[in-house]
Amino acid sequence: MKFLKILPSAILAVLILSSNALAYIGLCCAHCGGNMPLNIQGGGIPETHEFRFKLSQMYMSMDSLRDGTDEKSYGDYGPSTAAGNYRGVPKTMNSWMTMVGGAYSFTDDFAAMIMAGYVRNSMDMTTTATPSDYTMFSQGATDTKIMGKYRLYSDDNLAPKTQLSTILGVAAPTGKITIKNTNHPTKTMRGKLLPFGMQPGSGTWDPIFGLTYQKIADPYWMGVNFMTTQRLFLNAQDYKKGSEYTVDLYLMRQFHERALASFQLNGKAWGDYSDQPKKGKESGDCHAMLMSTRDWMTPLCDPTNYGGVNLHATVGIQFQPVPLQIAELNFSVPIYQNLKGPQLQSDYMLRFTYYWEVPTKKSRRYVGFKAPEKLGF
């Protein structure tokens, strides 16, 4: 944790205090904008007839409860059988997500992208059962995003300093929404649906829209990215997730021909769930005594205890180990959270991403297995 406390200050110092850099075209291809944080979806349009691939590993920690802007203790909500309390209360949550993405550029202005993921969640709970503490667990594939990105404007076709792009796509329901509890201390609760937040999927086909603005003022790269996922349809359990909206602002400084530092502000707003699952109504899953007329077992089961607004600050380092490949490390902490609660609040996120570009024989950059030196790699 000492390293994590030092990292943001060190990266900000590089951004602010580093001496004037030489002229750079960026670590990524000049056509796609040169530099962009790899955690932001769809950065730039790749060179025509080129592939790009991205592998990312993220760890997220959530610690303590929040209702609105007020931090709460789990003891404020139980565990207790008394009215107004819950029989099970979350304490902490850890999430590991692996994401794999690929893209191909068909023209100078259009690229198709696909992103898939796998998530592993563990949540520490305290309950009225014996033993009282246990760890709830789930894992599985997430929904898959299929998107197209079109460049609406650029001031130069080959190496733009200003460009505006739009993203249209869909999230396909490849993630499950019916994962069940396997290790609850009360045996009758095993085999029952896990709460919403432990399900890796949405169960619905969801449209995606985005808009990205990028600008270069060498050695600085900057931009703003807006994305929304709209939840319009009910899934097989007769509910839908809340729609999501994200806005990312970033500033990057390239201080070396193979390295740069970045700072981001990442805002997100999302809605609650429309209803409880069908299994809750029919079988009493997530209700006390497994009776649909009784109170919720835990605040995680209440569809209204989701949604909110948060803002994270993110610092990062990108490094080019070999031509056409980039490694990135990002660290994020929340600076504002307003949650419909009680629900677990964000503590911090750590993400490592590896990215590589693969020119095909049709690409203007194709030179066999050697790097295109004329573009500065």
Where are these regions (language model features)?
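Outer membrane beta-barrel transmembrane domains
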Residues: 66-79, 237-377
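Short loop/turn motifs that connect adjacent beta-strands in outer-membrane beta-barrel proteins
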Residues: 24-28, 41-50, 62-66, 92, ...
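Residues on the lipid-exposed face of transmembrane beta-strands in outer-membrane beta-barrel proteins
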Residues: 42-44, 55-57, 100-104, 114, ...
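Residues that define the transmembrane beta-barrel architecture of outer-membrane proteins
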Residues: 49, 94-98, 138-146, 162, ...
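Extracellular loop and loop/strand-boundary signature of outer-membrane beta-barrel proteins
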Residues: 40, 84-88, 129-136, 193-199, ...
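Residue-level detector of the transmembrane beta-barrel scaffold of outer-membrane proteins
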Residues: 52-54, 111-113, 147, 163-167, ...
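Outer-membrane beta-barrel pore domains and translocons
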Residues: 56-60, 117-119, 151, 169-173, ...
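Outer-membrane pore/translocation modules
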Residues: 117-234, 305
